[in-house]
Amino acid sequence: MKFSCRAATLALAGVACVASSALAHHAVQAVFDVNKPITVSGSITKVEWINPHSYISLDAKGEKGQVQHWTFELAGPGALRSAGLSREDRGGLKPGDQVKVEGIAAKDGTTTGFLNKLYFPDGRVFVLANKDPYAR
């Protein structure tokens, strides 16, 4: 079987495209502004324990008293389970719980963020990300 230089080049180009897409997908700084830390307190409206990333949505009061709907991205269920939060009870979180979230804001200016630290109603603190966002 003859393997041409053209076929090898095309195969390598394909692998490079897939690899770069995977890296971009998993780079927090591709979507979130690591230089824009945020803290949001509010009432949980939804917990999505799904792959490849889980999400917590909450309603918080804006600067002018208006309700803002926030969504925070977390790691996937496997990583959350390893960190001590289970899918079965959604990490002990349920709609109506008052929580505080520390994270980084989305680059596009929407009310979305990447969760670094979650303060539970019972006083527990869950740390998802290292303080150095490039360490992920």
Label the predicted regions:
Residues 67-80:
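Short, basic/aromatic beta-hairpin or loop at an interaction surface
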Residues 40-44, 98:
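Conserved hydrophobic positions within beta-strands
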Residues 23-38:
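Short boundary/loop segments of OB/S1/cold-shock single-stranded nucleic-acid-binding domains
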Residues 82-101:
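Short nucleic-acid-contacting surface segments enriched for D/E, G, S/T with interspersed K/R
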Residues 104-130:
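OB-fold/S1-family single-stranded nucleic acid-binding modules
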Residues 1-11:
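Bacterial N-terminal signal peptides that target proteins for export
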Residues 50-61, 68:
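Short aromatic-glycine-enriched beta-strand elements
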